Amino acid sequence: MASTRAAIRYAKAILDLANSKGVAEAVNNDMKSIASAIETNTELSTFIQNPTTTVEVKESALLEVFADVNGVTKGLFHLLFENKRFEILDAIAVEYNKLFDESNGVEVAKVTTAIPMDAALEAKVLAKVATLSDKKITIENVVDPSIIGGFILRIGDNQYNASVANRLQVLKRELSN
């Protein structure tokens, strides 16, 4: 919990700095690539979390891996190394993306399906979901085979569960009463 609060604070500060320098979108792209790299590369994640690796080694390695990032992002790296908080970099990247989207009026619609959505289906869902909100919508597809079929749509605090697993659960409750 504390690292999440710290990540939010760092993300807000970086967003403010990036906005003042006019590079918020470039930093957002950096944060997306950082979050994606840490999430998909277990070696990188383990390297960042490893307490036996010195701060200097981590800093030089990560500046080499993310050599093409914006100066504000490099400044964040340096600040995290100084404060010995580099283990929360992935959380900061995720929080920055959320704050950036929020400040630009973008809302994320999380669609959970049993199998990955193809581009055509994603376009149909996006068109339908766009009518439900006055904000710009982006789709995030989460694959969860346990829902068996159908989908679960979550936009902000609203959720619509049209999954087969949910229907079976409702049927089970009705039959047991």
Swiss-Prot record:
GO terms for cellular component: plasma membrane; proton-transporting ATP synthase complex. One of its GO terms (molecular function) is proton-transporting ATP synthase activity, rotational mechanism. It is found in: Cell inner membrane. It holds the Pfam family OSCP. It is a peripheral membrane protein. Its main location: membrane. This is ATP synthase subunit delta. Keywords: ATP synthesis, Cell inner membrane, Cell membrane, CF(1), Hydrogen ion transport, Ion transport, Membrane, Transport. F(1)F(0) ATP synthase produces ATP from ADP in the presence of a proton or sodium gradient. F-type ATPases consist of two structural domains, F(1) containing the extramembraneous catalytic core and F(0) containing the membrane proton channel, linked together by a central stalk and a peripheral stalk. During catalysis, ATP synthesis in the catalytic domain of F(1) is coupled via a rotary mechanism of the central stalk subunits to proton translocation. Belongs to the ATPase delta chain family. F-type ATPases have 2 components, F(1) - the catalytic core - and F(0) - the membrane proton channel. F(1) has five subunits: alpha(3), beta(3), gamma(1), delta(1), epsilon(1). F(0) has three main subunits: a(1), b(2) and c(10-14). The alpha and beta chains form an alternating ring which encloses part of the gamma chain. F(1) is attached to F(0) by a central stalk formed by the gamma and epsilon chains, while a peripheral stalk is formed by the delta and b chains.
